[in-house]
């Protein structure tokens, strides 16, 4: 199933609407608004992200990352001025006041590209940000997680459930999302 990116908030969905893929994401994904947090077997907190009446999207949508990537790649292929280059690896970045120069490695050799802008959208451990000496803004959690995608027949509601120290997995935490 694949749980890399899986949960997209309303604001992300609004941005995906601008790219023309919001409808595909919402129709394929699982929409949800309610989240519940438990300590052992007792619910200690809950929230409802129910959208305001004039909002077009739900609070959250769960969708496997590979579907979102598929929709974005298909949409990019339809847009003029966008060129996707597969199996190309940026190996160095030089930033100047007016431009940025990339050195790119391919199976056929190296080449350089100069651009006005560079967007480092290459993941949490971004080699591009590292080459530029940029830190990730925000919090980094060093905790280790086991993610398991399980196909099962169960009548769980489309909600986010999170347990601290659950009776079925003591001294740990568990997150349950419907996909």
Named regions from a protein language model:
Residues 2-77, 87, 94, 164, ...:
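Active-site-adjacent segment of FAD-dependent monooxygenases/related oxidoreductases
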Residues 43, 74, 117, 121-179:
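Conserved FAD-binding catalytic core of PHBH/FMO-like flavoproteins
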Residues 94-101:
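A short, glycine/Asx- and small/polar-enriched loop/turn
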Residues 108-117:
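Core beta-strand elements of the Rossmann-like FAD/NAD(P) dinucleotide-binding domain
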């Amino acid at each position: 199933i694949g749980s890399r990116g899986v949960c997209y908030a309303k604001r992300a969905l609004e941005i995906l609407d601008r790219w023309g893929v919001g409808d595909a994401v919402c129709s394929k994904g699982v929409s949800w608004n309610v989240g519940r947090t438990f300590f052992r077997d007792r619910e200690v907190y809950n929230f409802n992200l129910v959208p305001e009446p004039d909002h077009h999207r739900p609070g959250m949508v769960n969708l496997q990352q590979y579907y979102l990537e598929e929709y974005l790649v298909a949409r990019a292929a339809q847009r003029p001025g966008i060129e996707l280059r597969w199996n190309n690896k940026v190996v160095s970045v030089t930033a100047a006041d007016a431009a940025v120069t990339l050195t790119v490695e391919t199976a056929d050799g190296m080449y350089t590209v100069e651009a006005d802008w560079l967007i480092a959208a290459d993941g949490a451990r971004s080699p591009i940000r590292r080459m530029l000496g940029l830190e990730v803004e925000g919090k980094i959690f060093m905790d280790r997680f086991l993610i398991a995608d399980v196909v099962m027949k169960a009548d769980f509601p489309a909600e986010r459930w999170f347990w601290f120290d659950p009776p079925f997995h003591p001294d740990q935490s568990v997150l349950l999302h419907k996909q």
